[in-house]
Amino acid sequence: MLANDQKPVLIVGGAQGIGKEIAERFLKEGHRVAVSDIDEQGLSLLKKQHSELLTFQADVSSWESVQQMISAAERELGGIAHLVYSAGMTKSLPFLEVDFSLWKKTLAVNLYGLYYCIKASAPYICERQEGSIVVIGSGSAITGSGGGIQYYASKAGAFGLMRSLVKELGAHHVRINVIAPRVIESQMLDTLYPTEVEKRQLQSLIPVGRLGRPDDIAGLTLFLTSDEGSYLHGQIILLDGGRTYQPKYTEGKRAER
């Protein structure tokens, strides 16, 4: 077990997938946990599985909704020490097929929502003079990838947002970091790579020989909020099993992208 402060945690986008795994990991470590999501049904199911959780339905693309959610979470949790932003949406389309509606909707969730949640929660976290913010980003915003320009642009924007806050938040002893995974077993991966053949081809590109799992992200998130992670600040941590390093040959076979 990490030497964790077990202070209250708010996870935005935690009703399913990666966010849910993060919430369950923090619960296991003894934290007071609140989860926010737009998915009312997912929140209801999560609450049935973990009655000790606090849940709040919110639309992160709405500043008013975020304000109300953060205020309620701060009050009912007894404070917010750590914010984890795991909300996100994607759709894989060629650039010429991405219309303005999809562009705006994706940035509203992935970038504006992040800004809103930090804007609303930072006063509470900074007042404590300790705490952290962890953003679940995307490694493909570093490496680039075909299809989904609106998604990668929004995730790259999150990098800039994080870096711009390093000095200001650090002055209040609040740390901010981004976890940048690439291929993680999730609903989002199933959307982008719907067949087992595609998933196997993808796995062949990863030096460690497997796809990432939600618990890989949950464990790193826990570390970043722990005492052991207290000197990590302003970092983009690429979590991809070595995929970004793609050698020309692997075990006698040519590695194709």
Predicted regions mapped to residue ranges:
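The beta1-alpha1 cofactor-binding region of Rossmann-like NAD(H)/NADP(H)-dependent oxidoreductases
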Residues: 58-68, 100, 215-216
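Substrate-binding pocket helix/loop in short-chain dehydrogenase/reductase
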Residues: 94-95, 102-107, 202
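Active-site helix of classical SDR
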Residues: 118, 154, 162
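Canonical Rossmann dinucleotide-binding motif of NAD(H)/NADP(H)-dependent dehydrogenases/reductases
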Residues: 2-33
